[in-house]
């Protein structure tokens, strides 16, 4: 079964071809980071217009890359939500229109399920069940994953996501968009112990997170420095901030594995690309004889490959339904069912 995947939930246009027998055949991505950088964040209208320009050319590109044509497709998967309404509508409209013209089935994929399953695209993927850390600009969640569509929420952020805290800290430090990579690069120049920030809910006894207080603590620290906030001070704050976030995430992940009795952790989402987080998780897991699985770096952020894969996994068991142009900008992962 050959599935075309379309991702257009925010500021990346991702296309991919996944074959259930041969695996990932081709993928392509256009990022809008440069376009939105001048505004310090994503402008929804600009994002939608750019998806319109990019989706069909990228579709042709992945088909050529794989030596396939539209006639070879067995189905089309697209991101139905959550995300920006206009951006989702672009991908949905193109997917459903193509499918209607080719008489193909479609499946709307939950964006977060795509992220959750992205590590399964890698060689030697983990077997079910496992614990998943989904950590991005919009979500910070721990889940027990027993099968595709069988997700138990173990812990969630009570306020802001880790990725949002990275972006806010980047703005406070005068760094460029997107904030996560910029903070990480600056943190490499920081010195341990030069300043202190709290570790929110580190010892809360549950698996929930909170990062709003950490953002406030960074703001307070920046204001305390005032005119003395030079490059050295900024690097030290970035270092301490990254240490705080990664320490909390690592401890909660180890607790989730211990509480569930599982020994496999997968990490997905944009913050999952953070090198310091990977280092801490790998060290902590090695001490406890756990295994940690990550998607390749390019699949940590939004991409078409994860949508093609998730769609293929569900489409193998799904009945063909009526074509629908409905998008779900807000969509709880708990609402998903097994295929």
Curated annotation (Swiss-Prot):
Gene3D superfamilies found in the cross-reference section: 3.30.420.40
Keyword Acyltransferase: yes
Residues binding Fe cation, per UniProt: 111, 115, 302
Cofactor list: Fe(2+)
UniProt binding sites for substrate: 134-138, 167, 180, 274
A single GO molecular function term of this UniProt record: N(6)-L-threonylcarbamoyladenine synthase activity
Domain of life: Bacteria
UniProt keyword terms in alphabetical order: Acyltransferase, Cytoplasm, Iron, Metal-binding, Transferase, tRNA processing
Predominant location category: cytoplasm
Pfam family, one: TsaD
Catalytic function, reaction form: L-threonylcarbamoyladenylate + adenosine(37) in tRNA = N(6)-L-threonylcarbamoyladenosine(37) in tRNA + AMP + H(+)
Cofactor binding description: Binds 1 Fe(2+) ion per subunit.
Locations listed in the record: Cytoplasm
Entry EC no(s): 2.3.1.234
GO terms under cellular component: cytoplasm
GO BP annotation list: tRNA threonylcarbamoyladenosine modification
CDD domains membership: ASKHA_NBD_TsaD_bac
NCBIfam families reported for this sequence: gcp_kae1, T6A_TsaD_YgjD
Function: Required for the formation of a threonylcarbamoyl group on adenosine at position 37 (t(6)A37) in tRNAs that read codons beginning with adenine. Is involved in the transfer of the threonylcarbamoyl moiety of threonylcarbamoyl-AMP (TC-AMP) to the N6 group of A37, together with TsaE and TsaB. TsaD likely plays a direct catalytic role in this reaction.
Membership in a protein family: Belongs to the KAE1 / TsaD family.
Protein name per Swiss-Prot or TrEMBL: tRNA N6-adenosine threonylcarbamoyltransferase
């Amino acid at each position: 079964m050959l599935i075309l995947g379309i991702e257009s939930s925010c500021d990346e246009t991702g296309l991919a071809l996944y074959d259930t027998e041969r695996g990932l055949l081709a993928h392509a991505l256009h990022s809008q980071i440069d376009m939105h950088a001048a505004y310090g964040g994503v402008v929804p209208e600009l994002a939608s217009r750019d998806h319109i320009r990019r989706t069909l050319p990228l579709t042709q590109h992945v088909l050529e890359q794989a030596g396939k044509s539209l006639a070879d497709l067995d189905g089309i998967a697209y991101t139905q939500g959550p995300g920006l309404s206009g951006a989702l509508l672009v991908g949905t409209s193109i997917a459903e229109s193509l499918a209607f013209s080719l008489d193909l089935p479609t499946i709307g994929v939950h964006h977060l399920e795509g992220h959750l399953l992205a590590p399964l695209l890698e060689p030697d993927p983990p077997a079910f069940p496992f614990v998943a850390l989904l950590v991005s600009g919009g979500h910070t969640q721990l889940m027990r994953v027993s099968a595709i569509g069988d997700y138990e929420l173990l812990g969630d952020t009570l306020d802001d996501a880790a990725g949002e805290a990275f972006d806010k800290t980047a703005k406070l430090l005068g760094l460029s968009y997107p904030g996560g990579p910029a903070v990480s690069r600056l943190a490499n120049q920081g010195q341990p112990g030069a300043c202190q920030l709290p570790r929110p809910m580190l010892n809360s006894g549950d698996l929930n997170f909170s990062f709003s207080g950490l953002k406030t603590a960074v703001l307070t620290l920046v204001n305390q420095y005032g005119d003395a906030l030079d490059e050295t001070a900024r690097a030290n704050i970035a270092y301490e901030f990254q240490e705080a976030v990664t320490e909390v995430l690592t401890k909660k992940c180890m607790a989730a594995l211990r509480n569930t009795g599982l020994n496999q952790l997968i990490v997905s989402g944009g913050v999952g690309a953070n090198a310091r987080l990977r280092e801490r998780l790998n060290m902590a897991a090695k001490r406890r004889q756990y295994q940690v699985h990550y998607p390749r770096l390019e699949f940590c952020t939004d991409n078409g490959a994860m949508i093609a894969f998730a769609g293929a996994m569900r489409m193998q068991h799904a009945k063909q339904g009526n074509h629908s142009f409905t998008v779900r900008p807000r969509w709880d992962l708990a609402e998903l069912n097994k295929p």
